């Protein structure tokens, strides 16, 4: 379907660095609390050092995933450079004393070996590498651990290009147990907080570089590309808020893009709680197959009393159905309770 409509399809090759079989055994034994503790906090507790033989076995499994993706018609594979791959690269987390630990060459050995083997086994597929960068958080503190500091990331980026990686995706490192590091809520990080890092990486390589991290408007995305900080913009939560973000921009309707407010309530919080993914600004998210705004049988004149959240949404849907809508609001501003909610700091 993607190819029939002129789109390319990519998947992410991801190893969560959990021992999935061990977790599955705990579930089958009815040890739910123990399994849940490991699932939520395994990155800080219950850590075992994977053997070199097990690492090679993991690469074989990832190779098999790439083969299956190729057979399914997938065009691009993104190697997720965080989690297991990132923890091996990390000077903070990796305390190994074998060929996979110590200096930068050893710590990145697994990642580079994986990339080389993928290029060999699926040579006609685009290989993107998600490059997680550890960023400073105050004095002698860091945000994210499962990645590389900028100086090492710059060296590693050039090595990835030399190994045949086609594109690099610059992102905030995670692996701290705090999803807010990589998916920051409103006010916790500046807009475009990874752009300065992608710019440095882009200056060192000749392959395309993408960046992600609180780039929420078409204008901000365009500015990043125009000033040479990246070639591609990565969107995450914004596509839950408005799946037509890119289409609206391509059609010249940037002003109609529904902007993500980074509240994390329907998306990140629900991921953490293993709940249904949703969006507080997009009631259709997750229900695209069943919730359709269809034209009304006849057009009517509709008066909406109050320009609060409910009134504005009712007006929007009514207008899309073909009705002639007039909104009446007694105050000088629309928004209702949102105006009060926006007053506290960081809102």
Briefly describe each language-model feature range.
Residues 324-347:
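Rossmann-like dinucleotide-binding cores of NAD(P)H-dependent redox enzymes
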């Amino acid at each position: 379907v993607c190819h029939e409509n002129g789109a390319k399809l990519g998947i992410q090759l991801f190893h969560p660095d959990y021992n999935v079989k061990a977790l599955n055994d705990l579930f089958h034994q009815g040890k739910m609390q123990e399994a849940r503790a490991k699932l939520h906090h395994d990155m800080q507790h219950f850590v075992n050092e994977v053997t070199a033989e097990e690492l090679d076995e993991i690469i074989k499994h990832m190779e098999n995933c790439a083969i299956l993706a190729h057979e399914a018609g997938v065009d691009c594979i993104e190697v997720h450079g965080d989690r297991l791959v990132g923890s091996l690269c990390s000077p903070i987390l990796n305390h190994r004393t074998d060929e996979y630990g110590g200096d930068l060459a050893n710590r990145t050995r697994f990642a580079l070996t994986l990339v080389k083997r993928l290029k060999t086994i699926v040579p006609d597929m685009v290989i993107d590498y998600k490059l997680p960068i550890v960023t400073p958080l105050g004095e002698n503190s860091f945000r994210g651990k499962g990645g590389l500091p900028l100086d090492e990331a710059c060296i590693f980026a050039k090595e990835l290009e030399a190994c045949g990686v086609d594109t690099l995706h610059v992102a905030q490192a995670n692996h701290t147990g705090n999803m807010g590091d990589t998916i920051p809520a409103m006010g916790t990080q500046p807009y475009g907080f990874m752009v300065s890092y992608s710019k440095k990486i882009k200056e060192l390589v000749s392959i395309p570089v993408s960046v992600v991290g609180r780039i929420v408007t078409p204008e901000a995305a365009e500015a990043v590309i125009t000033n040479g900080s990246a070639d591609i913009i990565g969107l995450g939560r914004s596509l839950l808020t408005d799946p037509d973000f890119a289409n609206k921009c391509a059609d010249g309707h940037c002003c109609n893009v529904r902007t993500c407010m980074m509240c994390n309530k329907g998306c990140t919080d629900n991921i953490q709680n293993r709940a249904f993914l949703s969006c507080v600004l997009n009631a259709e998210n997750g229900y695209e197959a069943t919730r359709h705004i269809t034209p009304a049988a006849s057009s009517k004149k509709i008066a909406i009393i109050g320009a609060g959240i409910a009134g504005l949404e009712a007006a929007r849907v009514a207008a899309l159905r073909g009705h002639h809508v007039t909104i009446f609001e007694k105050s000088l501003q629309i928004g209702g309770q949102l105006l009060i909610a926006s007053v506290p700091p960081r809102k």
